[in-house]
C-alpha cells in the first residue's frame, strides 16, 4: 500500500526491423508509442486520467493498432490508491471495448525502479512472450475498488498466453514526475513481421 522505491538497471539494443538479418535473435517489436504531458493541470505529483489516456491513444494511432488486439497491459501501478485509481480510469476509457483485459505490474515483484521502471517492464513482457505465458502479479490484500466489476482483471497466476492466430501483443504504461506519460505497444516477433530490405541500396565506402 504505497510507493516502495528500489534500484535496478536494464538495457536494450534497438534495431530497425528492416535491418534484421535472417536467423538473428529478436525479442520483440515496438509497434507503437505515445508520449504526453499533463503536468500543468494539477501539480508535480498529481496524475491526470485524460493525460494518460492521451498517451495511450497516441500509441495505438502511431502503430495503427486496434485496441481490441491488446491481450495484456502492464500498468505503471505505483501502489497508491489515488494514482492507481486514476490509471485504471484512463485504461478503461481507452480499452473500454475489450471484454476482458489481463493487467499486472512488475512493481509488485521489484518495487518502483524509478528511472528503470518502464524499461524493466519491456524486458518482462518480451520474456513472457518468448515463453508464451501471461506473467503473474502477486496480489496481497483487497483488489482496488475501481478494478472491481470492470473489464480489467489482475493476472494473479501464471497462464498460457493464447492467441487467435495473430501475434502476441501487449501495452505498457509508464508515468513520471511532472506529468510525463508514456505508452508502448509491444508485439512478439515473427519472421513474417520482417519487411523486405531494399536491395537497390548499397553501402559505399567513405571517400579518402
Q: Across the structure, where does each feature detected by a protein language model lie?
A:
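Condensing-enzyme catalytic core of the thiolase-fold
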Residues: 1-208
Amino acid at each position: 500500500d504505497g510507493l516502495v522505491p528500489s534500484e535496478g538497471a536494464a538495457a536494450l539494443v534497438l534495431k530497425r526491423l528492416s535491418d534484421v538479418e535472417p536467423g538473428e535473435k529478436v525479442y520483440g517489436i515496438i509497434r507503437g508509442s505515445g508520449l504526453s504531458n499533463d503536468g500543468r493541470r494539477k501539480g508535480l505529483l498529481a496524475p491526470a486520467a485524460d493525460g494518460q489516456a492521451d498517451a495511450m491513444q497516441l500509441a495505438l494511432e502511431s502503430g495503427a493498432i486496434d485496441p481490441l488486439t491488446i491481450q495484456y497491459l502492464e500498468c505503471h501501478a505505483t501502489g497508491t490508491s489515488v494514482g492507481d485509481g486514476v490509471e485504471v480510469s484512463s485504461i478503461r476509457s481507452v480499452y473500454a471495448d475489450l471484454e476482458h483485459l489481463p493487467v499486472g505490474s512488475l512493481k509488485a515483484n521489484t518495487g518502483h525502479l524509478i528511472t528503470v521502471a518502464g524499461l524493466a517492464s519491456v524486458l518482462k513482457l518480451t520474456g513472457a512472450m518468448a515463453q508464451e505465458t501471461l506473467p503473474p502479479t502477486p496480489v496481497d490484500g483487497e483488489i482496488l475498488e475501481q478494478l472491481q466489476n470492470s473489464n480489467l482483471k489482475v493476472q494473479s497466476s501464471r497462464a498460457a498466453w493464447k492467441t487467435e492466430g495473430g501475434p502476441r501483443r501487449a501495452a505498457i504504461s509508464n508515468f513520471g514526475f511532472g506529468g510525463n506519460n508514456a505508452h508502448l505497444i509491444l508485439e512478439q516477433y515473427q519472421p513474417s513481421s520482417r519487411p523486405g530490405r531494399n536491395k537497390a541500396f548499397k553501402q559505399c565506402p567513405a571517400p579518402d
